[in-house]
């Protein structure tokens, strides 16, 4: 049986503010991601677990972070961040379909948004899918155990209203 501990290493062992992700993942006409942030650009099309938090946060990312708001998994970090931004009203003044949890994010808010990426090594698609779900469950469980059997706020799907951060 695989480990029941979340043992993925956060990319660059740090949180990335939204502004840094946006500049690298969508650099604009004539610019290239790898010239803006080579390290972050190296994982933009990778699969893995991502954690979204609201600063202040600890230095080293972990899924049991006090101000963690969401844990998710994806086969492409850039595509998933685009979906989140579209639904959270970050790219435009309105919200659009793309990421269901982002509808619970305060519309357009990015000032204290921090994201950690935990890449997973590429493998056969059916194995990658299983590993993504397994690690997402481990990450959510790490938060659940440390925070009195509660889920990260945006992972609570029955809450129809945007979360208010204090």
Where would I find each of the regions flagged by the language model?
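Boundary/linker segments flanking structured domains
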Residues: 1-69, 73-166
